[in-house]
Amino acid sequence: MKFSKMLTAVTEILNQDSDTQVDVCLTSQMASAIELWTAMYENHAPWVDRKKVKSAQIPAAIASEIARLVTLEMQSEITGGEAAAYLNQEYQRKVLLDLRRYVEYGCAKGGLILKPYMTKTGLAVQYVQADSFFPLSFDDSGRILQCVFTEQFRKGKKIYTRLEVHTLRNDMIHITNRVFVATNDYSLGTEIEVSSVDRWSELVPELSLAGSDRLLFGYFKVPMANAEDTDSPLGVSVYSRADELIAEADQRYSNICWEYEGTQLAVHIAESLLKYNTDQNKFEYPGGKERLYRRVSYATGATDKPFIDVFSPAIRDTALFNGFNAQLRLIEFSCNLAYGTLSDPQNVDKTATEIKVSKQRSYTFVSDTQMALQRALEDLVYAMNFWAALYGLIPPGNDYQVSFVWDDSIIVDAEEERQTDRQDVAMGVMSLAEYRSKWYGETLEEAAKNLPEPALVEE
């Protein structure tokens, strides 16, 4: 079921009961936008028909690059008391190991929920993409107060749907599971018992938990103003402001593809010069090169038109590539990417100052995204700690700390900075100990001890 249809169905179900009536903050306008961003990321944009308009796969490239920059050389760990060792082991193995891929999904679709849950073997983490959850309400700090998660599968002619509703009310977390079965995609169908579906038979219909001041998941959203719906607290795709620019870029890319296809070398050859194979009911081409030759019927003699004519027009690739490259630069600006990220870096006709400004713009956005991801991961670890303590895997309490180290190489060229520091040492404005401490990861005391002895000069 499409995301916008699912939103309507979920709202209708919740509003049937006075106890669950909601004023959904996720509007149909935002639902349609999320559908578009998802289609663009999955290479199914509405303007792409695979014939006249091909996809240059720009949305996926943008989301992938931003996710790479955000998680580049990222370091994070959980330290502290007795619980920290267990939490950190699960955190490193089940969260950080494959985090970049899920951050890419979040960047593409505007948001991502990181939701821990308990299994028979311990903690697990579910990554819910923006087209599979429905935030119903938020608090003033931007944390979700109520959210619906959906899961759906087909079995024969029946469609099974599970709604998992998380609500924070009066310092209590309420989790409910409701299951529906239908025979079409137009509605969720009839509600049935949760235990009647094998896949969900171990889930409880209702659960209430005390001792948490937030819902038990982390919510990552792209830190951009929502230009699609300025009243919505939801995140937007990293390419949300470039959909029309990307559509034009796909058109220009398609023109380039057609230029190469339409100007392929060909030989127009008269039918009279070809041998006709009666057994196969077709003409035979010299050397079997059907792609090279194009059969032509001439109604006039050879004096008016040669029997063999070579078709080899000039390719206008330079002009077309320049136009495509210019479009990519517009996309880079709209998506907070430095010039040369998507476009040809050799053709970036910018001054050193302009290039630095574009890198600074990208760095600022990446830094904001890193902080948004950090908040989501902190909430995730809080939820992991809650579940692990609830099931007796660790002692109760919050005796842990989460640390983060983010890379800044997007704006700082390490080799260039190192060369500058060497010049400062030569001028005497930076000591050798300071240089060694900075570049060798030593304290000033260690660096001073490790400096080479000055060479003895004989008089």
PLM regions with names:
Residues 198-354, 401, 405:
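Extended, charged amphipathic alpha-helical segments
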Residues 439-459:
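Long, highly charged low-complexity segments enriched in Glu/Asp and Lys/Arg with interspersed Ser/Thr
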